[in-house]
Amino acid sequence: MDLHLIGFLLWFFVVQVTTSSAHRNITTTIPALIVFGDSIMDTGNNNDIPTLLKSNFPPYGRDFPGAIPTGRFSDGKVPSDIIAESLGIAKTLPPYLGSNLKPHDLLKGVIFASGGSGYDPLTSTLLSVVSMSDQLKYFQEYLAKIKQHFGEEKVKFILEKSVFLVVSSSNDLAETYWVRSVEYDRNSYAEYLVELASEFIKELSELGAKNIGLFSGVPVGCLPAQRTLFGGFERKCYEKLNNMALHFNSKLSSSLDTLKKELPSRLIFIDVYDTLLDIIKNPTNYGFKVADKGCCGTGKIELMELCNKFTPFTCSDASTHVFFDSYHPSEKAYQIITHKLLAKYRKYLNT
């Protein structure tokens, strides 16, 4: 097993044991969770920027504490919240661009992810959202604020002890590829994304982040909207898109292996593809009734403004669906995915 992976996993799961202790007054080993990426992790950064890609209105958030639509692209919590809570850091994490963010809120981490973003800079331009490069600029601003309010030692502590997660590529693969298809075929575009993702990791490491988890692409061809657009009358998964995601994952994993030898950071490749695909292919095994349609509206195409409080046919119980809208999983699915990943890594460590 790679020494970087052993180090990351030992560090990660010692924290899991520590934070699951009954003695909640013990100082948490991980001070903060800091996340970059897209709508899978976004907790509301798009709310106050000029983009159509928003979810701060019902029925989004209907299963969130207080039934508040916060700008999370789901019925409830998203993985960044679930991971933060699992690590004993916080029950939810704020968006960095949130208007109510106070200096003390910065200490447990923030979310820089912006729904609609991607590794390809064209992706964020097309959707008018926060690009990955701008997310890094905001991160530098965040570090400056930590230094201003809490001192240089606190900055070093957060950089060395926090978890940094990067979750992107879905919008690139599902949307921007069609614009780029004049320049690239599917495989070469996936490889272009790997170059961009690798450069992002290098820059994040150069800024001092020591513990970085990089998520794989997901089976985007099985998203309800992609089934509707490309799956034919039976709305099957669009395998050409899934194969592009698999090629991206393979090349990204290899690139990360190379980066582990070059960078001082601990790096781990988190493969979520098979986990989500198994839930989609075998929904009843996980307590779901519907996997090919979202809960909102008909479940076939509704997303963002098309998924609103007036949208007819919205299901009464989102926990019966793998997806909440035509692109994003329900909170129940996110909970299952997150805990399956934790169990997977724990088992891997014990081999």
From Swiss-Prot:
Locations listed in the record: Secreted
Disulfide-linked positions: none
A Pfam family per the record: Lipase_GDSL
Entry keywords, A to Z: Glycoprotein, Hydrolase, Lipid degradation, Lipid metabolism, Secreted, Signal
Glycosylation sites per record: N25
Highest rank taxon of the organism: Eukaryota
A Gene Ontology BP annotation from the UniProt entry: lipid catabolic process
Catalytic machinery residues: S39, D325, H328
GO cellular component entries: extracellular region
InterPro entries: GDSL, GDSL_lipolytic_enzyme, Lipase_GDSL_AS, SGNH_hydro_sf, SGNH_plant_lipase-like
Xref: PANTHER family: (RAPE) HYPOTHETICAL PROTEIN, GDSL ESTERASE/LIPASE EXL3
Name of the protein in its database record: GDSL esterase/lipase At3g14820
Source species of the chain: Arabidopsis thaliana
